[in-house]
Design a protein with these regions (language model features):
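A short, N-terminal "cap"/entry segment at the start of jelly-roll beta-barrel domains
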Residues: 1-45, 127-129
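Conserved short histidine dyad/triad with adjacent acidic residue
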Residues: 33-34, 48-64
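Short histidine-centered beta-strand/loop micro-motifs
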Residues: 38-39, 58-64, 105-107, 126-127
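Well-ordered beta-strand scaffold positions
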Residues: 46, 76, 84-86
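A short hydrophobic beta-strand segment most commonly corresponding to one strand
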Residues: 49-51, 95, 109-127
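Short beta-strand His + acidic residue motifs that chelate non-heme Fe in jelly-roll/DSBH
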Residues: 61, 79-80, 96, 102-108
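Glycine- and acidic-residue-biased ligand/ion/polar-headgroup-sensing regions
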Residues: 66-67, 72-77, 82
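Short acidic-glycine-tyrosine-enriched beta hairpin
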Residues: 83-98
Length: 129
């Protein structure tokens, strides 16, 4: 089904050039890990690739002054966002609202791979534990 959400004549194209940058290496069987600050490519979002093969492992409890979205690419995770505990699997997308403490861990079995989208041109974080 075709989408026609706006009239392109009412919103002129952005004059920025297309940009390509590498956030992580995909060669070999190892987990994808890396990041790319949005400001490096003129974007409003910073992208992180996170992965672990260890059950129970994940980022420590932390908070940002902006929203963070998570896309589970592979495996199963348990997210702790504010007072919520949310189980997620490959294909799920989650949101940690600005100012809400959050963390996640590999719920297994196998590898957990996520793409984490910081809705900021740079990564700003305070660890809470």
């Amino acid at each position: 089904m075709a989408r026609r959400d706006y009239d392109p004549a009412t919103a002129p194209p952005d004059d920025r050039p297309a940009v390509k940058a590498r956030a992580f290496d995909t060669a070999g069987p190892r987990a994808w890990r890396g990041s790319l600050a949005g400001e490096a490519i003129g974007s409003a979002n910073t992208i992180l690739a996170y992965a672990t093969d260890t059950i129970g492992e994940g980022p420590r409890l932390h908070v940002h002054p902006y929203d963070e979205s998570f896309v589970v690419i592979m495996g199963h995770a348990r997210f702790f966002i504010g007072d919520e505990v949310i189980d997620a699997a490959a294909g799920d997308v989650l949101l940690a609202p600005a100012g809400q403490p959050h963390r996640f861990e590999n719920a297994g079995p196998g590898r957990l791979q996520t793409i984490d989208i910081h809705h900021s041109p740079r990564w700003i974080q305070t660890d809470l534990d």
